[in-house]
């Protein structure tokens, strides 16, 4: 089976328009992010807390802490150009 870690993403939209956001994760082979829709809508001025899971096969996440990176792409209705921001975290292997 897969090894999973759970993360609570706190996403804030400080703009005056709805934000459209997509997320992914990287750090090692065969890692995937689950628990989010393909595109998430965050209303203007809103903050959402979303639990997500990051999963991989145990052979890729040996015992200990492994650096991973969440990648977020977003745009607003007015500005259709995708922008991005990355956040570092850790995946705990067994």
Give the residues covered by each predicted segment:
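Asparagine-centered strand-capping/turn motif at beta-strand->loop junctions
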Residues: 10-15, 74
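Short edge beta-strand/loop segments characteristic of extracellular beta-sandwich folds
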Residues: 6-12, 53-55
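Short, solvent-exposed loop/turn segments enriched in Ser/Thr/Gly
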Residues: 2-7, 48-49, 63-68
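Terminal connector regions
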Residues: 56-94
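Transition segment at domain starts
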Residues: 1-7, 89-94
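Intrinsically disordered, low-complexity Pro/Gly/Ser/Thr-rich segments with frequent PxxP/GP/PP motifs
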Residues: 31-59
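Short aromatic-acidic-glycine turn motif
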Residues: 27-37, 77-81
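Short acidic, flexible loop segments centered on an aromatic residue
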Residues: 16-30
């Amino acid at each position: 089976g897969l090894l999973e870690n759970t993360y609570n993403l706190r996403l804030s939209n400080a703009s005056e328009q709805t934000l459209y956001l997509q997320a992914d994760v990287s750090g090692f082979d065969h890692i995937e992010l689950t628990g989010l829709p393909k595109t998430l809508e965050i209303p203007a001025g809103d903050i959402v807390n979303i639990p997500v899971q990051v999963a991989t096969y145990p052979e890729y996440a040996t015992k200990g802490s492994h650096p991973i990176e969440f990648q977020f792409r977003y745009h607003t209705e007015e500005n259709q150009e995708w922008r991005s921001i990355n956040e570092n975290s850790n995946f705990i292997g067994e």
